[in-house]
Amino acid sequence: MTDKINPIVDVLPFEAVEFLTSLNFSKRSYNLGYATKRLDVTRKVGDRYKVEYVERGELVNSEECNRWSDFKKCTVPTVCPQEAYRWFNSEGFLNLRIVETIGNDCASNYFVQVIVQNGALIIMESEVKNSASEAIASLFDSAEFKAVASKRIPH
């Protein structure tokens, strides 16, 4: 885990979007791999947990484990501030997630992941900050975010 993750924009293939929307969100969590832009899908299968590594819409590897704690070290969804959610929703953005990332030193850092649908599914991440509000602010100020916001969905 690096100290800073620059904002990135990635467009997922249609197959991956279809795969995500077909899943039961209550039992799964998703994150976009930083370097490889790999999508990790964590699923509970019976009494076991399965992590699938999906790259460009294709399953490239999978692992199973008996304990959720073995996967918990990756990314854990947290509750998103309502004011930020309302802002994104009013501007035509479909979803905002704040993800708590746990590094090797077990310190909690935050970054914002925005999912926008405007002809394609776009995932954008902010820089890593010490608090959720700082992460949101850093994303709002980024050139990448402003470029997407200027092309928001009409409503």
For the regions a language model picked out, list residue spans one by one.
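Terminal, regulation- and interaction-focused segments at domain boundaries
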Residues: 2-8
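Long, hydrophobic N-terminal alpha-helical segment
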Residues: 8-15
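N-terminal segment of the canonical double-stranded RNA-binding domain
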Residues: 16-28, 32, 37-129
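Ampiphathic alpha-helical segments that act as solvent-exposed interaction surfaces
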Residues: 119-155
